[in-house]
Amino acid sequence: MSPTPSSGPVIAPAPKGILDPATGRPVGAHDPYFLEVKHELSDKGFFVATADDLITWARTGSLMWMTFGLACCAVEMMQVSMPRYDVERFGFAPRASPRQSDVMIVAGTLTNKMAPALRKVYDQMPEPRYVISMGSCANGGGYYHYSYSVVRGCDRIVPIDIYVPGCPPTAEALLYGVLLLQKKIRRTGTIER
């Protein structure tokens, strides 16, 4: 049995990727930087870049993160790895060991007893290392701010690069924080932090 030809026009499937709602084209399709790269590659067959640009590009595309889930925010952190959000498509893959990680996500209430463990794990991470503070409890103590046993913000123990607000913050908020971290790495470079 042969397929029957349709009398109407054939509609191509929508392009994949993030589309600009104003133009309907993929985001970055008319970015001058990418147009310059495309022209240089088609003209010369290779692309010239500085070592710092190459290292920064590689680092932002392969950030390995480890969890330091202390409370309910860790559930949202797990959700960002699931198929709906799939943070790995942005090059953000989980690791179990701090020695293999570039990013640590602190999610939840940090107590005085847990603070030395947090610092020890942070010190085991290779340079350059980044920390995302996720949720009100990690950012400033949250609901337990006035408790005698709570550290009022994990920035008192380790330096924080990105703060993700919320109680608990949504998976979208964490994903946005990851994208902000990648933007920060691109802006500051990697050779010198």
From Swiss-Prot:
It catalyses: a quinone + NADH + 5 H(+)(in) = a quinol + NAD(+) + 4 H(+)(out). The keyword Heme does not apply. PROSITE patterns: COMPLEX1_20K (PS01150). InterPro entries: NADH_UbQ_OxRdtase-like_20kDa, NADH_UQ_OxRdtase_20Kd_su. [4Fe-4S] cluster binds at residues 72-73, 137, 167. GO terms for molecular function: 4 iron, 4 sulfur cluster binding; iron ion binding; NADH dehydrogenase (ubiquinone) activity; NADH:ubiquinone reductase (non-electrogenic) activity; quinone binding. Its EC number is 7.1.1.-. The keyword GTP-binding does not apply. It is found in: Cell inner membrane. GO terms for cellular component: plasma membrane; respiratory chain complex I. Keywords: 4Fe-4S, Cell inner membrane, Cell membrane, Iron, Iron-sulfur, Membrane, Metal-binding, NAD, Quinone, Translocase, Transport, Ubiquinone. It is a peripheral membrane protein. GO terms for biological process: aerobic respiration; electron transport coupled proton transport. Its cofactor is [4Fe-4S] cluster. Belongs to the complex I 20 kDa subunit family. NDH-1 shuttles electrons from NADH, via FMN and iron-sulfur (Fe-S) centers, to quinones in the respiratory chain. The immediate electron acceptor for the enzyme in this species is believed to be ubiquinone. Couples the redox reaction to proton translocation (for every two electrons transferred, four hydrogen ions are translocated across the cytoplasmic membrane), and thus conserves the redox energy in a proton gradient. NDH-1 is composed of 14 different subunits. Subunits NuoB, C, D, E, F, and G constitute the peripheral sector of the complex. NCBIfam families: nuoB_fam, PRK06411.1. HAMAP family: NDH1_NuoB (MF_01356). This is NADH-quinone oxidoreductase subunit B. It comes from Bradyrhizobium sp. (strain ORS 278).
